[in-house]
Each structure stands twice: as C-alpha cells, then as structure tokens.
C-alpha cells in the first residue's frame, strides 16, 4: 500500500516515519501542480469539512490507486483547489458547532475506510494471545 504524503519539513517527515522507514515510499513534490504532473491524472479525494459527501460513500475500488489529500489543521485545503474536486471531496461527519478532529485521527479514519473497501490486502487479519491459547 504505497503512501504519498506531502510534508512541509524534513522534521515532519522524520517524525511521521518513526521506525517504519523500510516500509515507506516517501515522494517529494514541489507543490500540488507538481504532484498532478508526476501522477498521470490521479483520482484524488479531498478530505475537507466543506465536502458534501461522507468519506464512507465512495467505492474505493480494489484496483484503483487512491490518493487522499488532507489540508493543514488550521486552514484545510485551499478553496481554489477544492473547486475542481466537488464530486471527490469527502468529509467525516461531525456534530454541529464542534471543532473537527485533529489531522492524525482524520487520516487514520479515512485510510482504514479505504483499506476496508479494498479487503485489507496484505494485512494480518487474526491476532493471537501471547501467554494463553484461545
């Protein structure tokens, strides 16, 4: 499951990778236009509080590359970008007048929904006790 993440600093990349560097595919882009050029007409879901569609609605097909863009916690994705993605903008339902979830929680929720739609390929589906048997 390749991850493409846009970070603003080297420090953010190192913090996000922790001890999983051998499992990450980090790609760097100059800006959003650079990302679009290098990823041959990608289907992008824009995760935003401004969206009309709930994150669980898309099919996230098994054979499609799924790109989900999240904005900064403080500002979100610029509206100039969102204008071109009305149908693929998605949101996590929230109670009215309640601040949105933090970015890491939002990424986890949406990423696992995509993985669920795609059958959790390559994921361990069963756990086991360490000191006892079921």
Spans of model-derived segments:
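A short beta-to-alpha transition loop/helix N-cap that caps and shapes the active-site region
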Residues: 8-10, 133-134
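Short, small-residue-biased leader/transition segments that mark boundaries at the very start
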Residues: 1-6
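Mobile beta-alpha loop/short-helix "lid" or hinge segments that flank ligand
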Residues: 8, 79, 83-86
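S-adenosyl-L-methionine/SAH cofactor-binding core of RNA-modifying enzymes
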Residues: 12-79
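Structured adenosyl-cofactor binding patch, chiefly the S-adenosyl-L-methionine
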Residues: 84-134
């Amino acid at each position: 499951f390749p991850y493409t993440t846009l970070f603003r600093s080297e420090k953010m990349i190192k913090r996000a990778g922790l001890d999983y560097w051998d499992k990450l595919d980090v790609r760097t882009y100059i800006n959003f236009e650079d990302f679009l050029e290098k990823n041959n007409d990608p289907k992008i879901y824009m995760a935003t509080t401004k969206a009309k569609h709930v994150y669980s609605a898309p099919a996230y097909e098994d054979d499609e590359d799924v790109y989900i863009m999240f904005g900064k916690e403080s500002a979100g994705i610029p509206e100039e970008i969102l204008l071109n993605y009305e149908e693929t903008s998605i949101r996590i339902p929230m109670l009215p007048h309640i601040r949105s979830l933090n970015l890491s929680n939002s990424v986890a929720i949406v990423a696992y929904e995509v993985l669920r739609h795609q059958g959790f390929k390559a994921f361990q589906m069963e756990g086991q006790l360490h000191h006892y048997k079921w």
